[in-house]
Every structure is written in structure tokens, then in C-alpha cells.
């Protein structure tokens, strides 16, 4: 004899214990108690009585201005700020706009010893290059920091730090 599987759906004729059976379609498709089933009044018939909301008068008058007083507006000083989008200062000269002399220039480079040069010197000294070889990083421009200057007024436009 085959046993019914526990995951099979229940049979149609069974009812749950303690629960009444659901209503039939005829019972629920009857008249809705919240809406009247009678005919609606004609649309051209006007409702009698007050409007549903109190009306409020709207006055578009502006407050009176004092005569004889001139209208003054504050003076605003405008300063133009030139932003150079995507300008990256590297180890080669770039075309930039100098905010001091207001010229479009190609930058002048100046190299200075930064942290990478000193760390390279210390690293070479640790490995035994004490007799002058540890000073080689001070001669290599690719290890130094780069400062970009304006060739006209010598103002600093940007700095490229190696480390």
C-alpha cells in the first residue's frame, strides 16, 4: 500500500480544523455594501447647500514701497578664477596659465632633492656603498622632486613630488 507523500498538496474535500470554509463566488459577487446600487443623479443637477470648503479671498497687492527712496543694490566684486582641468605636473614642461602674470606659458623646471633621493642614499649606504657611491641618487634627476615655474615672473605653478 502506497503512503501519501508529506509534501503533496492537501486534498480538495478536506477542511482545516477550526477554520470555516471560504465563501462561495455567489456570496462574494453580490452587491457591495459600501456603494449604493441605485442609479446616479443626473450630472446637470446642481447641489444645494454651501460649498464643501470655505472660500478665502486672495489679494495680489504688493506692499507699498516708500516713495522718494532710491533702490540700492549691493556692489559685488567679481574675481575670475582660472581652473586648469586635467593639468598634471610631471617631469616634463607643460603648457599652463600663470595666475600672477596672466600669460599662457610653457613651464620652466627646477629639480630639488626630496625624500626619495635621501631614502635612496640611505639604502645604498646600508648595502655597503659608503665610499661615495651612496651619493649617486643626488645626481639622478628622475629621483628628484620637480617644481614648475613661470618663465616670465618665476612664480611657482606646480610641484611634482616623487615620494
From Swiss-Prot:
<keyword id="KW-0238">DNA-binding</keyword>
<comment type="function">
    <text>Plays a role in endosomal protein trafficking and in targeting proteins for lysosomal degradation. May also contribute to the regulation of gene expression in the nucleus. Binds DNA (in vitro) and may play a synergistic role in the nucleus in regulating the expression of numerous cytokines.</text>
</comment>
<dbReference type="GO" id="GO:0009898">
    <property type="term" value="C:cytoplasmic side of plasma membrane"/>
</dbReference>
<keyword id="KW-0539">Nucleus</keyword>
<keyword id="KW-1003">Cell membrane</keyword>
<keyword id="KW-0472">Membrane</keyword>
<feature type="region of interest" description="Disordered">
    <location>
        <begin position="1"/>
        <end position="23"/>
    </location>
</feature>
<keyword id="KW-0862">Zinc</keyword>
<feature type="domain" description="LITAF">
    <location>
        <begin position="78"/>
        <end position="162"/>
    </location>
</feature>
<dbReference type="GO" id="GO:0000139">
    <property type="term" value="C:Golgi membrane"/>
</dbReference>
<dbReference type="InterPro" id="IPR037519">
    <property type="entry name" value="LITAF_fam"/>
</dbReference>
<dbReference type="InterPro" id="IPR006629">
    <property type="entry name" value="LITAF"/>
</dbReference>
<keyword id="KW-0333">Golgi apparatus</keyword>
<protein>
    <recommendedName>
        <fullName>Lipopolysaccharide-induced tumor necrosis factor-alpha factor homolog</fullName>
    </recommendedName>
</protein>
<dbReference type="GO" id="GO:0098560">
    <property type="term" value="C:cytoplasmic side of late endosome membrane"/>
</dbReference>
<feature type="binding site">
    <location>
        <position position="153"/>
    </location>
    <ligand>
        <name>Zn(2+)</name>
    </ligand>
</feature>
<keyword id="KW-0967">Endosome</keyword>
<keyword id="KW-0479">Metal-binding</keyword>
<dbReference type="GO" id="GO:0098559">
    <property type="term" value="C:cytoplasmic side of early endosome membrane"/>
</dbReference>
<dbReference type="GO" id="GO:0008270">
    <property type="term" value="F:zinc ion binding"/>
</dbReference>
<dbReference type="GO" id="GO:0005634">
    <property type="term" value="C:nucleus"/>
</dbReference>
<feature type="short sequence motif" description="PPxY motif">
    <location>
        <begin position="22"/>
        <end position="25"/>
    </location>
</feature>
<feature type="region of interest" description="Membrane-binding amphipathic helix">
    <location>
        <begin position="116"/>
        <end position="136"/>
    </location>
</feature>
<keyword id="KW-0804">Transcription</keyword>
<feature type="binding site">
    <location>
        <position position="101"/>
    </location>
    <ligand>
        <name>Zn(2+)</name>
    </ligand>
</feature>
<dbReference type="Pfam" id="PF10601">
    <property type="entry name" value="zf-LITAF-like"/>
</dbReference>
<feature type="binding site">
    <location>
        <position position="150"/>
    </location>
    <ligand>
        <name>Zn(2+)</name>
    </ligand>
</feature>
<dbReference type="GO" id="GO:0098574">
    <property type="term" value="C:cytoplasmic side of lysosomal membrane"/>
</dbReference>
<comment type="similarity">
    <text>Belongs to the CDIP1/LITAF family.</text>
</comment>
<dbReference type="GO" id="GO:0003677">
    <property type="term" value="F:DNA binding"/>
</dbReference>
<keyword id="KW-0963">Cytoplasm</keyword>
<keyword id="KW-0458">Lysosome</keyword>
<feature type="binding site">
    <location>
        <position position="98"/>
    </location>
    <ligand>
        <name>Zn(2+)</name>
    </ligand>
</feature>
<keyword id="KW-0805">Transcription regulation</keyword>
